[in-house]
Amino acid sequence: MFLNLLDAPRRLLALVALGCVALLAFGLYLQHVVGLEPCPMCIVQRYALVLVAIVAGLTAITSNKKGLITGSGVLLLLAGFGAFVAARQSFLQWYPPEVASCGRDFYGMIETFPLQRAIPMIFKGSGDCAKVDWTFLGGSIANWSFVCFAVIGLTALTLIARLARQR
């Protein structure tokens, strides 16, 4: 089935956008129904997922090959960024900092500090980022987020390679 979707890149990109919307909806369910509060790194991953959904959706409506390749390239970069943040959070969960502090929340960091100071603070993580509140099949939300971003990145890379070979 996946190989059939590769022959229809616009359909595959629409499926990626729809999958991202479903993941975002599940994140909101975990936050507002289950009661899990997202940490700063979770929020950055959500923003990356929103951008992936927008780029995948816009690229899906593109009809020319150059636009599909360019959109898939941007998708690859965004998925790589999301995977990096998820991998960093997974690392913090596996090897929590010795001094776990709650730290500031995401918006507090952005509002209080200049951007060049706030961004490193976000990636440093806090006690909240190292905490595992929910698991599925032994993986935390950050672990599954990494898997999703990796699949999106591999899909974009495969699309680029396939489209570049077509005449």
From Swiss-Prot:
Superkingdom of the source species: Bacteria
Membrane side Cytoplasmic: residue ranges: 1-12, 64-69, 163-167
Periplasmic side: 30-47, 88-143
Pfam families named in the record: DsbB
Assigned keywords, A-Z: Cell inner membrane, Cell membrane, Chaperone, Disulfide bond, Electron transport, Membrane, Oxidoreductase, Redox-active center, Transmembrane, Transmembrane helix, Transport
Gene3D superfamilies: DsbB-like
Keyword Iron listed: no
Function recorded in the entry: Required for disulfide bond formation in some periplasmic proteins. Acts by oxidizing the DsbA protein.
Protein family per UniProt: Belongs to the DsbB family.
Protein name: Disulfide bond formation protein B
Native species: Polaromonas naphthalenivorans (strain CJ2)
Gene, per the UniProt record: dsbB
